[in-house]
């Protein structure tokens, strides 16, 4: 089991939690981004830089993901793709993507895209909060307790 991170938009506090978890649980955490990312020295942490371009990092994450892996992303289509491969998907706010909720999330995203393209200001997500970080940490710890190294 490895953890793959859609790192371009992942909050720094979440990356720091993942770095600590990698060392503590001795699991591989791979950050995928279209820019260079500085990571702490560890045999459990690596960074993959992909060329800039639309969905290039997402495609690389899908390529790397295997059944049982954990993918950290807020990108709903990416979450759907890794779920199709049997991986787990968690957003940085601690919310799970699942086979049960992904279609609804994709439909909501499509509707919001349509509203924005017709000129409606739909706003954006709320700023990342300490509560979001705590929710993520809790879900990550639960997942690692169940699926981490034996």
Curated annotation (Swiss-Prot):
CDD domains: PIN_YqxD-like
Transmembrane segments: none
InterPro entries, sorted: UPF0178
Coiled coil regions in record: none
Family statement drawn from the similarity comment of this UniProt entry: Belongs to the UPF0178 family.
PANTHER family: UPF0178 PROTEIN YAII
Protein name: UPF0178 protein BamMC406_1579
Originating organism: Burkholderia ambifaria (strain MC40-6)
């Amino acid at each position: 089991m490895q953890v793959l991170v859609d790192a371009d938009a992942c909050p720094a506090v979440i990356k720091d939690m993942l770095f600590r978890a990698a060392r503590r649980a001795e699991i591989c955490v791979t950050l995928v981004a279209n820019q260079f990312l500085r990571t702490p020295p560890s045999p459990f942490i690596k960074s993959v830089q992909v060329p800039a371009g639309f969905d290039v990092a997402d495609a690389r994450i899908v390529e790397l993901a295997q059944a049982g892996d954990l993918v950290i992303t807020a990108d709903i289509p990416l979450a759907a793709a890794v779920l199709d491969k049997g991986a787990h998907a968690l957003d940085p706010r601690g919310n799970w993507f699942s086979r049960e909720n992904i279609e609804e999330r994709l439909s909501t995203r499509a509707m919001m895209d349509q509203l924005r393209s017709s000129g409606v200001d739909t706003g954006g997500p709320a700023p990342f909060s300490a509560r979001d970080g705590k929710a993520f940490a809790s879900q990550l710890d639960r997942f690692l307790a169940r699926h981490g190294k034996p």
